[in-house]
Design a protein with these regions (language model features):
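Gram-negative bacterial Sec-dependent N-terminal signal peptides
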Residues: 1-22
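A residue-level marker of the well-folded mature domains of exported/periplasmic proteins
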Residues: 22-311
Length: 311
């Protein structure tokens, strides 16, 4: 589906801090769900690089705000962008089920809106709203198929879930379970949320080990929790690779963990593709160009055999 958007003649430059610079610049406000997320930090860095890549007279400046995982704070940031009369808004939503008001306020103000990394839960986005995301179910399927093949279709797994308010958690896990349905010999021993955090992943796996729970693999919704799981297993003397661990994101730490054998695999979520795509989509929308409303950046599996290709 394509969505038409409004025209503005503004262009040039980039702003890294709060507030905007020259009045002639095309201004884009960006609200990120949280700055302390490893993957989203990489997305943010690529957004900055993309914004700085445009030629003089046709560039943009970005104003980043940290919502600190607070839905109310994020809405307030969007409202501030609207009051500043920015040319476009990019949002990495805190809660994918709570984006309707953000979309409503932006569209009523006539300001193009792009969601990045996390797509709102609603099936159809309003006119003037676009999303640059990846198919999270695909990531879950890639993880589980790799692990199922390595286990020979038999064994026990545990699942580390991300933030339960995030549909990436729901959809990645849905993909995992779609594959599991083909392998009745693989059972889920435990399934709990680690909220995307390394220390939470480590704590959960440590607790399961203390409880005497036996499992052959850890399926994690992201690399950070997967690395935490590897740390927990190492702390009790488990030989690396004897319990298979799969993550998602392909962060630098995740790639290093695959290269060292701490993770059996990860799934590359293209931070550059998402960051570049969001800035370019917002820029085109602000200039009145028509773009695809749903831009999907593909996932790619990472194993010891190809990890060097992602570094």
């Amino acid at each position: 589906m394509k969505t038409p958007i409004r025209f503005t003649a503004l262009a040039l430059s980039i702003l890294l801090t709060s507030g905007f610079a020259a009045a002639a610049d095309l201004k884009i406000g960006v609200s990120m769900s949280q700055f302390d997320d490893a993957y989203l930090t990489t997305v943010r860095e690529y957004m900055l690089k993309q914004a700085s890549s445009y030629p003089k007279g046709d560039g943009v400046q970005l104003q980043f705000e940290d919502a600190r995982a607070d839905v109310v704070k994020q809405l307030s940031q969007v409202e501030n962008f609207i009051s500043q009369k920015v040319d476009a808004i990019i949002v990495n939503p805190v809660d994918t089920a709570s984006t309707a008001r953000i979309s409503k306020e932006a569209t009523e103000a006539g300001i193009p809106l792009v969601y990045v990394n996390r797509r709102p839960d609603q099936k159809d986005l309003p006119k003037g709203v676009a999303a640059v995301t990846s198919n999270d179910e695909e990531a879950g399927r890639m993880q589980m198929q790799y692990i199922a093949d390595k286990l020979g279709g038999k064994g026990a797994i545990v699942i580390l879930l991300g933030d339960l308010a995030n549909n990436s958690t729901t959809n990645r896990t849905k993909g995992v379970k779609e594959v599991l349905a083909k392998y009745p010999g693989i059972k889920i021993e435990q399934e709990q949320t680690g909220a995307w955090l390394r220390d939470r992943g480590m704590t959960l796996v440590s607790d399961w080990l203390t409880q005497g729970r036996a499992f052959n693999a850890v399926i994690s919704n992201n690399d950070e929790m997967a690395i935490g799981a590897a740390m927990a297993l190492k702390s009790v003397g488990t030989k690396p690779g004897s319990v298979l661990i799969a993550g998602v994101d392909g962060t630098q730490d995740g790639l290093n963990a695959v290269a060292k054998g701490d993770l059996a695999m990860s799934v590359f979520q293209d931070a550059k593709g998402q960051g570049d795509g969001a800035v370019e989509a917002a820029r085109k929308m602000a200039k009145g160009e028509t773009i695809e409303q749903n831009i999907v950046i593909p996932f790619k599996p990472i194993t010891a055999d190809n990890v060097k290709d992602f570094k």
